[in-house]
Regions:
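Residues that mark the start of a beta-strand
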Residues: 68, 188-190, 249
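Periplasmic-binding protein-like
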Residues: 128-135, 192-195, 224, 245-255, ...
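Alpha-helical recognition/docking segments in bacterial nutrient-uptake
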Residues: 1, 6, 66-181, 243, ...
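Flexible loop/turn connectors
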Residues: 239-337
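N-terminal helix-turn-helix DNA-binding module of bacterial transcription factors
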Residues: 1-65
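Hinge/beta->alpha junction and helix N-cap segments in small-molecule ligand-binding domains
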Residues: 77-90, 108-116, 167-178, 194-239, ...
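A short helix->loop->beta-strand "cap" motif at the edges of active sites that frequently abuts
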Residues: 149-153, 189, 274-277
Length: 337
């Protein structure tokens, strides 16, 4: 029916034509975030064709595109996670490729949330179809609170107890366990753990503890060292341990960047990797393949992560359960076997 038709069309008529519920039509006409941009645009087109009065919203993203996505990085330990971090760059690239495959635009927001109000601001000030938060930081309960609203969002991060929001992340517990078991099987007895205190790193630490117990090794509190997410923090921490004559023959790092910082400190002290100390990382960034020695690490599937994060925003699906991606041990030169 063209623009010359009468204006007696009802919400029920639009719902029947669109093959959706009346409530979905109502939400779409009010541009509510729980409805995907594709569904909104289909309902808006029907409303226009049938002269149904509504506020004409501009589509998010390029004309004809499926929508747009905003990417937000919360504060980590009191400051924004740097977008220049190699893993963040790889994850952003995967999100971008997945968005392009769906003819969807994406933007990286300047907002770095530290509390619930910041999360609300991030999800309500954007014209995007939804928001991808990179990491939970200390915002798990605030994200649970946000999930009770109409905000459309997904989190890259750990699965947490009592979680009510959708997340995509890797099996951090298994990844930490695999890295530690590998060192134990190589005969390493005094294995140092270096990691930040964000939820993902803490799960990797739990895997480290499980593997030590499974290998009959006692966990030494002196060998569990919190570090920042930058390589400089790891280099400084390992340097201090060496100067204090704390003995260790293996390192499980919660990221590749932390592992590379540790290797710098070992080299400055005249120690050989892997001759004196075997080192494992986590992420399998490009740098891990280019370093000397090349880095044994735990691979996260960022390509699949990007695809799932984008689909959780754009697809009308009731299957918004958290997704746990497998991790793989990638053995290279830094462990010597």
């Amino acid at each position: 029916m063209g623009s010359g038709s009468n204006n007696n069309t009802t919400l029920e008529d639009l719902a029947r034509l669109a093959g959706v519920s009346v409530s979905t039509v109502s939400r779409a006409l009010n541009d509510q975030p729980l409805i995907s941009t594709r569904t909104k645009q289909r309902i808006w087109a029907l409303a226009r064709d049938h002269n149904y009065p509504f506020r004409h919203y501009m589509p998010a993203g390029p004309i004809g595109a499926e929508g747009s996505i905003a990417i937000v990085t919360p504060h980590m330990r009191g400051r924004p996670l740097p977008l220049s971090h190699p893993f963040i760059l790889e994850l952003l690239a995967s999100i971008g490729e997945a968005a392009r495959a769906r003819d969807c635009d994406f933007t990286v927001s300047h907002i770095a949330p530290t509390n619930y109000d910041d999360l609300v601001h991030a999800t309500t000030t954007s014209r995007a179809s939804g928001v991808i938060f990179i990491g939970q930081s200390a915002l798990h309960e605030a994200l649970n609170q946000l999930a009770s609203t109409n905000a459309r969002f997904v989190v890259w991060g750990a699965q947490m107890p009592g979680q009510r929001y959708t997340s995509v992340g890797s099996d951090n517990l298994l990844g930490g366990r695999r890295a530690t078991l590998h060192l134990a099987r190589l005969g390493r007895k005094q294995i140092l753990y270096l990691g930040s205190t964000d939820p993902e790193a803490m799960q990797r630490r739990a895997g480290y503890s499980e593997a030590l117990a499974e290998s009959g090794l006692e966990e030494d509190p002196k060998l569990v060292v919190p570090v920042d997410f930058e390589w400089e923090s790891a280099e400084a921490a390992v340097g201090r341990l060496i100067r204090r004559h704390v003995a260790f023959d293996g390192i499980v790092a919660s990221s590749d960047l932390i592992a590379l910082g540790a290797i710098r400190a070992l080299r400055k002290a005249g120690l050989s990797v892997p001759g004196d100390v075997s080192v494992t990382g986590y992420d399998d960034m490009l740098l891990s393949r280019l370093s000397t020695p090349t880095l044994t690490t735990i691979r996260q599937d960022t390509h699949e992560a990007g695809r799932l994060l984008v689909s959780r925003i754009l697809d009308d699906s009731s299957d918004h359960m958290p997704a746990l991606l497998p991790t793989d041990l990638i053995v290279r030169e830094s462990c010597g076997g």
